[in-house]
Amino acid sequence: MACRAKELVSLILYKICNPKRSDSKIEEHVEEVEDLKAEAELFRSGSKIEKHVEELEDLKAEAELFRLKAISGTEELKAVADVKRLRTILENNSGTSEECKGEMLKEDLFLPSDLVRLILSRLSFKDNIRSSTVCKAWGDIAASVRVKSRRCWLLYHDAFQDKGVSYGFFDPVEKKKTKEMNLPELSKSSGILYSKDGWLLMNDSLSLIADMYFFNPFTRERIDLPRNRIMESVHTNFAFSCAPTKKSCLVFGINNISSSVAIKISTWRPGATTWLHEDFPNLFPSYFRRLGNILYSDGLFYTASETALGVFDPTARTWNVLPVQPIPMAPRSIRWMTEYEGHIFLVDASSLEPMVYRLNRLESVWEKKETLDGSSIFLSDGSCVMTYGLTGSMSNILYFWSRFINERRSTKSPCPFSRNHPYKYSLYSRSSCEDPEGYYFEYLTWGQKVGVWIEPPHSISIYDYSILDPSEAVNTEYVFI
């Protein structure tokens, strides 16, 4: 541009010297100079505009970011406030005056129903019941998401009759007992190994080889398992994770007379044609010779010995032994394990006064429980089930059916009745009750019946079967204490 200006100056000087010859050229170049000035001014203005546009965009971005942060913070504060209001309602509900409750109902209960449903669905049975008393809306939602508590019936199995195997049910809540029914699907040598989810794991007690099968006494469906030629059932404790109709079902067996150097474990899944056998190092040789029942909880199988807790992980195929503080031993150990909401409990009925313990996982100790906080535990040789929600005389009790306990129990009832009769122990009164409470006998038998607690389907009622009338029973003339 400087060169162009010099050229124009030269032309102007030439014009002065030669005014007639260069007028047109000078005018032409003057126009070019004006155009260049206009372009320069436009360029300068455009640069400023672009700069301002960029600044404006930056301001817009900052404003949008501030707005989003404000919205996020508001929503977070609202969520925190909702949770605080919910906690206040739950904590103060039982002891709040009607006036204060009314104020809370107006201001604090305005929570989205989806949020209330989500929260109540994750509460325990006890907290769900408590939450349902807040207001009618909450009561309806709590009832819709409430997990039904387990029901337990006693299945009694008699193989000593000439007519063959018979069985029946006893509902301790309704205090009703069914009449006995024939069971041609089973042989007299059938034994019950384990009960869970309404199914029984059974075997032929006369066979040294573990001939096992699943049996559903409600549908009479039977599922045979392949022969287990390694584990003799008489020396092995068995359990299963869930109903065999589910793909996740796993049968677990552990040999309780394993050698001093190894623990033998067998597993089987529905659809498999053979068992899987594995040996694991026995880190505590003398501890796993007297095992109680096997507990399946949260994907793991647990076995309790005198001073340790054995844990088998079927996914990782690992066996671990966790030392725990020992519980005083009796000459004859009678123990069960069960679980409720992730907590593991142990019932020790080795003495005449049963004790209940809960596992403290952090400190590896069994903590003694004086009560069950409203729960109840049903115990038999093939099952141990913990329930919640029972009331009255069925709350905070241990309900036993065990041939070992029945044999040692002092009673005024005739021998055949005492050996074939369940009884409950109250943790409130620390005493046992032998009142039959509806458990009557159709006939007198000198053989010992087999009994196991079983969880019936929720769609089935004890009244779906023929109920034994007390007037037809043979033991109503005896006095039970």
UniProtKB/Swiss-Prot annotation:
- Residues in domain F-box? 105-156
Lineage, top-rank taxon, reads Eukaryota
InterPro entries from the xrefs?
F-box-like_dom_sf, F-box_dom, Gal_Oxase/kelch_b-propeller, KIB1-4_b-propeller
Q: Which CDD domains has this protein been placed in?
A: F-box_SF (cd09917)
Q: Which SUPFAM superfamilies match?
A: F-box domain (SSF81383), Galactose oxidase, central domain (SSF50965)
Residue runs in coiled coils: none
Q: What is this protein called?
A: F-box protein At1g49360
What species was this sequence derived from? Arabidopsis thaliana (Mouse-ear cress)
